[in-house]
UniProtKB/Swiss-Prot annotation:
It catalyses: (S)-2-(4-chloro-2-methylphenoxy)propanoate + 2-oxoglutarate + O2 = 2-methyl-4-chlorophenol + pyruvate + succinate + CO2; (S)-(2,4-dichlorophenoxy)propanoate + 2-oxoglutarate + O2 = 2,4-dichlorophenol + pyruvate + succinate + CO2. The gene is sdpA. Belongs to the TfdA dioxygenase family. It is an enzyme of class 1 (oxidoreductase). Keywords: Aromatic hydrocarbons catabolism, Dioxygenase, Iron, Metal-binding, Oxidoreductase. Pathway: Xenobiotic degradation; 2-(2,4-dichlorophenoxy)propanoate degradation. 2-oxoglutarate binds at T129, W242, R268. Optimum temperature is between 35 and 40 degrees Celsius. The lineage of its organism: Bacteria, Pseudomonadati, Pseudomonadota, Alphaproteobacteria, Sphingomonadales. One of its GO terms (biological process) is catabolic process. It holds the Pfam family TauD. This is (S)-phenoxypropionate/alpha-ketoglutarate-dioxygenase.
Amino acid sequence: MSPAFDIAPLDATFGAVVTGVKLADLDDAGWLDLQAAWLEYALLVFPDQHLTREQQIAFARRFGPLEFEMAAISNVRPDGSLRVESDNDDMMKILKGNMGWHADSTYMPVQAKGAVFSAEVVPSVGGQTGFADMRAAYDALDEDLKARVETLQARHSLHYSQSKLGHQTKAADGEYSGYGLHDGPVPLRPLVKIHPETGRKSLLIGRHAHAIPGLEPAESERLLQQLIDFACQPPRIYHHDWAPGDAVLWDNRCLLHQATPWDMTQKRIMWHSRIAGDPASETALAH
């Protein structure tokens, strides 16, 4: 039986736009069809949803427990005033850091499963969210490089990735603390991940990854940058141009994502609900 909604694949190795469905009214049969599509496409885009906070949280919960229910990713302060780049406060540091390709919570003991992200207010230009298919990236590696990365691991740290931008994080950093700053031992993760539900292999890289055991620091950095540069190229990438009311659901176990710049004199208000990873498959090798 075909699903009760329409699926239009993106012009990329992954992703689809889903129409003919209201996520707030999704029944159990529809959710099962949607989950199957998510595992196939890894990224689902839902235009014109206009979810309330409660509806977004409820939809995200259908995929499992949440790492956190809702976080505002925005250059607008709670009092309505605009953050400016020169403020360089915790949230501005997060916004700038998120412009590097990354997967969520790889620097935590348990990596996130996925996320629901929605747009409330968007700028007139810029502010897209990019996604990159690490399944297709792994498949496209030459056999020698594929064999090499199969044997390697890397450390993942938000302290490391933010320090590369000149941001010195602290355990007590206000908005970092809610974002999942991990102050324990640095997690170690394989460069090649096997998806726990589909069995497909993908690269596990991104801006938090560093310090491959057995390699000199410079060689480790070169290899990780080489992999990102190769992986995050067409047809393995898609950048979503947001409209108010859009929602997306992505699989954090096989995609990277990034924010893109915009004129920060314009408001951008986004809402992020993060789906917790299953400890059986998403726990770091060491942490």
